[in-house]
Amino acid sequence: MVLIRVLANLLILQLSYAQKSSELVIGGDECNINEHRSLALVYITSGFLCGGTLINKEWVLTAAHCDRGDILVLLGVHRLKDVQTGVSKDVQTRVAKEKFICPNRKKDDEKDKDIMLIRMDSPVNISTHIAPLSLPSNPPSVGSVCRIMGWGAITSPNVTLPGVPHCADINIFDYEVCRAAKPELPVTSRTLCAGILEGGKGSCDGDSGGPLICNGEIQGIVSWGGDICAQPREPEPYTKVFDYTEWIQSIIAGNTDATCPP
């Protein structure tokens, strides 16, 4: 019954969530059905939609600003219509049993420490279209080509929604490139700067919480951006997962009092 309600709401969200969500993939193409096995669809029952990343059978990584109500996690999703009609047999749905946000996060700043761990109510089964993604062993270097993916808008500011996840390749830049485009960013930050300087490709409304993948590891989390997506000379900041690996591993190990780096 819960899944039926979720799928019905997803139909409504296809028409309405652009006004309520935060980031999507612009300038990409439909992802290959086999390349997004770790991509989670994070549905918040208040009507907000995010992406997420499966990092082991029981845990999903997403953005802290996606914490806007009770959460359902769908894995193995490709074409939303197939899920809604029951054609897709590889989809698994889980309830968020626990949610963990950095206890030292600034409560009045959604951009601060924008990372959240979701523990699902039961482990997922690894399958053809569901598998976890590795945490980073090292941070990505400037110039790296990385992959973003999600169900977010594919045009901006006039929103077009795809119904399938879209993927795009973007580049890692020095953090100062993002600071030049967004002076409100702090002098130092635990974020990655990524995008295309010419514009035309990037995350946008609806992709929040989704992954920035470099060399088969989750290196970033879609966090926030401008009013119009994928603008020239305006790469976007992504939460830098490498800086939070110790916190992530501590929480998963049962140390729920662990704090994030300042």
UniProtKB/Swiss-Prot annotation:
The keyword ATP-binding does not apply. Expressed by the venom gland. It is found in: Secreted. Its EC number is 3.4.21.-. Coiled coil: none annotated. Residues 25-253 form the Peptidase S1 domain. It is an enzyme of class 3 (hydrolase). GO terms for biological process: proteolysis. Residues 19-24 form a propeptide. GO terms for cellular component: extracellular region; secretory granule. Glycans are attached at residues 125, 158. Snake venom serine protease that may act in the hemostasis system of the prey. This is Snake venom serine protease. It comes from Crotalus durissus durissus.
